[in-house]
Design a protein with these regions (language model features):
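Bacterial N-terminal signal peptides that target proteins for export
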Residues: 2-12
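Carbohydrate-interacting regions of secretory-pathway proteins
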Residues: 24-454
Length: 454
């Protein structure tokens, strides 16, 4: 054998050994036609296994049903194929557990879920926190991925869990990227969703080729989609690579200054408390403005309202004060308010002063894709403002795009002309502007303030 052929043979042999080693890292989740090592929780939907394929069949008037592994998993890559009958909702639990429930003798399943959604909403492969926090990564964050799932066809799926990062994939494309530390270990489960009445009774969901890699789990290289980081005041390595920077690190507010030119923190009107920027009720110092101006940008933040409170996040902010007068910072406002208890939410026109609205200009959608958009009082909400280079601006609230408009359009100009801002020339039309956190003398807290320029 000549030297070249010997070298090629060694290379091929090494490749085969490497592939065989990689294949050995995978284990089947099912053993033949047996549910040995699995247990059912919740409702009484029917599960059967034949030729390595699991079929779940819906049963009317029973809670969500789960066929789960007895074993818990921490870091892993899970792959499977799934087929869902049109009209049925389902999911795959991971890093999940049970908690006591008076209505369920074996406890209530809770934890992360890879959604299987045949409805028009089409959020398959989004991440839902079953019986806990609700939607963590709705597929509205990655709109093109809504069209990947095929009802009543076999689809390939992949879940990657390594440390505090979770990525999901559907038919070879990345759907979600979550950073969260709530649960780091738990079982894997196959869900058949509860149904009301008999219309969808007997509907089926099928799984096959379930396999798991716990020996060498790795995250796939990010595909540049939006990353939802729930860990407060932090940036993951992929976020940094996308150009995100923190505007508050949980300890110091060095990226902000008082709009009145005084130290808002020495007056105790603003305070860093429990890793959040908190406005004290009854404070008089005023707003905080960013030290830097921004053009096209994506701004992420979390906010927490107390009952009856009012605040706001303003952007493309400019100083409209006359020469020699005190600063008069004005800009477009993402309204933050208790819709039920603060009187200003009832003012304006058709709800354009409610939470997440473009204040005094455009009301937020109260429902998106048949779902009521939540606005929490006393717990954290996720806000997001995206100002694209083409002038389009979006307001997001807890995973829903609730306002969208174009700065400088005819509609925008007409709305401004009929608002409290009509006397300010070129209102909201500057190429760049400051960000502003509004102090309305009510207790409101902010955290996880981060931005990237587009």
């Amino acid at each position: 054998m000549d030297k070249l052929n010997w070298t090629l043979t060694k290379t091929n042999l090494s490749l085969l050994i490497s592939l065989a080693s990689f294949a050995d890292d995978w284990d089947p989740l099912l053993s033949g036609n047996s549910f040995e090592g699995w247990e059912q929780h919740g409702g009484v939907a029917k599960y059967e296994i034949k030729n390595g394929e699991v079929t779940g069949t819906s049963v009317a008037n029973t809670p969500n049903s789960f066929m789960t592994t007895a074993r818990a998993y921490t870091d892993f890559v899970l792959e499977f194929e799934v087929w869902v009958q049109d009209g049925l909702n389902s999911g795959v639990q991971f890093r999940s557990n049970t908690k006591p429930d008076p209505d369920l003798s074996d406890g209530r399943v809770f934890g992360y879920q890879f959604e299987l959604d045949t409805a028009e909403r089409a959020w398959t492969a989004g991440i839902y926190d079953e019986a806990n926090r609700g939607w963590l990564y709705p597929v509205s964050y990655n709109e093109p991925a809504r069209y990947l799932f095929k009802n009543e066809q076999w689809n390939t799926a992949r879940i990657e869990c390594v440390g505090n990062e979770v990525q999901t994939f559907l038919n070879g494309k990345q759907v979600s990227h979550l950073v969260d530390e709530k649960t780091i270990s738990g079982f894997i489960g196959l869900q058949v969703h509860s149904i009301r009445g008999s219309e969808h009774e007997g509907y089926k969901v099928r799984w096959r080729n379930l396999r798991i890699n716990t020996q060498s789990p790795k995250l796939s290289p990010p595909e540049g989609i939006y990353i939802r980081n729930i860990k407060p005041n932090s940036l993951s390595s992929p976020e940094k690579a996308q150009g995100w920077t923190l505007l508050f690190n949980g300890r110091k507010a060095n990226e902000w200054k008082s709009a009145k030119g005084i130290d808002a923190f020495s007056k105790k009107d603003w305070e860093v408390k429990d890793e959040a920027l908190m406005i004290h009720a009854g404070s008089k110092v005023g707003d905080l403005v960013s030290k830097k101006a921004y053009g096209a940008f994506e701004f992420d933040f979390e906010f927490r309202l107390t009952e009856g409170a009012n605040s706001g996040v303003k952007y493309f902010v400019s100083d409209f004060a006359a020469p020699g007068q005190a600063a008069n910072y004005l800009g477009l406002e993402y309204q933050i308010i208790d819709d039920n208890l603060h009187p200003d939410a009832k003012q304006g026109v058709v709800g354009n002063r409610t939470g997440a609205s473009l204040y005094d200009l455009i009301p937020r959608y109260q429902e998106v894709q048949t779902r009521k958009v939540p606005l929490h009082i006393g717990s954290w909400n996720h806000g997001r403002i995206v100002a694209f280079p083409n002038g389009t601006v979006q307001h997001w609230l807890n995973g829903f795009n609730v306002v969208e408009y174009e700065r400088g359009s005819n509609i925008y100009d007409a709305l401004v002309a009929r608002s409290k801002y009509e006397k300010y020339e070129n209102f909201g039309l500057e190429a760049k502007g400051l960000l502003l956190l509004q102090n309305h003398n009510d207790e409101v807290s902010y955290r996880s303030l981060k931005i990237r320029e587009l």
